[in-house]
Amino acid sequence: MLEQASNLHLFADVLARVHAICAALAKDGNWPEGIDVSRVVVEPPRDPSHGDMATNAAMVLAKEAKAKPRDLAEAIAERLRADELVAKVDVAGPGFINLTLHPVVWARQLGTILRDGDAYGRIAPVVGAPKVNVEYVSANPTGPMHVGHCRGAVFGDALCSLLQFAGRDVTREYYINDAGAQVDVLARSAFLRYREALGEEIGAIPEGLYPGDYLKPVGQALAAEHGDRLKAMPEAQWLPIVRDKAIAMMMAEIKDDLAALNIRHDVFFSERSLIAGSTNKVAETIEFLRERGDVYEGRLPPPKGAPVEDWEDREQLLFRATAYGDDVDRPLIKSDGSYTYFASDIANHRHKFERGFADLIDVFGADHGGYIKRMQAAVKAVTAAQAVLDVKVVQLVKLLRNGEPVKMSKRSGDFVTLREVVDEVGRDAVRFMMLYRKNDAVLDFDLAKVIEQSRDNPVFYVQYGHARGHSIFRNARDSFPSLPVEEGARLAFLRQAKLEKLADPSEIDLLKRLALYPRTVESAALAHEPHRVAFYLYDLASEFHALWTRGRDLPYLRFIIDDDAELTMARLAMVQGVVSVLASGLAILGVNAPDAMR
């Protein structure tokens, strides 16, 4: 039985060893004190034929060490060759170092998976790390969620789970845009449906109001609650009544839609509360900026090229955004005296900082790409650069069926709803496929393809990998009935396996893939890119399925060898490693890991 030599994941373990070698060389060679090793990395080489790992240590430290990169690489390589983990070290090119590890190291890493189960790769809470606030979805409460909202919702939810797995304290937030002109349009649209519910013939929906049938229940609820008394009121009197009812019903529907996708939020924060609360936080924030010289009365120059949003040729109150990296200063108050959306957003992010968040992440739709610089400038200003805002832009989703665009629904009027998609293909397919492409790339989502049972359908292929693993366990009990059914007991049982029996190159390759998981999670969390986990899971499932297929053709590679209990237990331990990692990664993505599939 093998034990993992370190609680670090394997790449971090080797990096620590490289750091120790550099520290020893620095002491022996009188390098400058405090030499910066933060840029030293240990990662898989681009070409697997170059070895198992590569480090840039010599390339990034040579200047400070006052040495030639190649000479420094040879010195580091000489000490690495004495390391118990390392079978071979090569210096390539101007000073890159490639390492090949002993095969037993990969089996030892499997021992760590058997110890940790689906917690393998989880990072302990980071002491002293700033609290993270992730704002995502934040769809206007003016209608049901559409398939475009779906991608941002899944991305934000998976990112939160990823960050929590990586040891961060995360709050999931939804910002309710309930204070702008669009909710007044919602109220007027709902009032039309209210009149319809009272028996009026309303005809075609006027341009500028929200079409579709989804506001009919709001109109019916208003009629049931108020009868016809709202009709006699002037707009200024009925509008807030209708608006509040419509917002409440739309938010209830949005929350139901999110629940269908298992999207969770800890906080639903109202934009209106910034203005209508006991303190007008927007006015307070503007005054805060004024005291620091970050707002002024001025006139913006005419836009060059593409129109600048909110530009008006008049003297107005401006935020000095250019002082914080933006391209142009930004208006805070409209000509009618109301606040710009940007002013409310500044107050919202200042409020987050006051609540103790210094690591802020906003998930924006593709149409908000031009909003990034101004928001990052605002966060710098209102937090004195003590908070950092990362904005992740989620690109459009093209909804297809067998390659053809999907028609819009009557209920929504001009879009396909999230609920329609989830009802047709299921939550797991939606969640996985929304993450199976980098967030800033347009996504083609084909309703027919995502339910195919083939390797061309990534969600099926990954889930089938987990189910296949459990199928192997069930079959193994026919010959080895002592193999436990319960997960924890099975992990403990398989920890006794002789993992050094895993020696075939295809088995070692699979073990190497398993060893990559903690590094994948760590790098995905640092980059705020959950798609990396989805890509990794597909690659892992592919290698697992390929090994199973080879065993069907080559009996000596089968997972279950009836007359060789030791080899079978080692291979079942490897299968358990695959099952545990697939379950862990799918949990981060919010996708079910089935034990069986039809």
Swiss-Prot record:
GO molecular function term, any single one: arginine-tRNA ligase activity
Native source species: Bradyrhizobium sp. (strain BTAi1 / ATCC BAA-1182)
Tagged with keyword Signal: no
Family classification: Belongs to the class-I aminoacyl-tRNA synthetase family.
EC number: 6.1.1.19
GO biological process, one term: arginyl-tRNA aminoacylation
Protein name as catalogued: Arginine--tRNA ligase
Keywords: Aminoacyl-tRNA synthetase, ATP-binding, Cytoplasm, Ligase, Nucleotide-binding, Protein biosynthesis
Keyword Protein transport in record: no
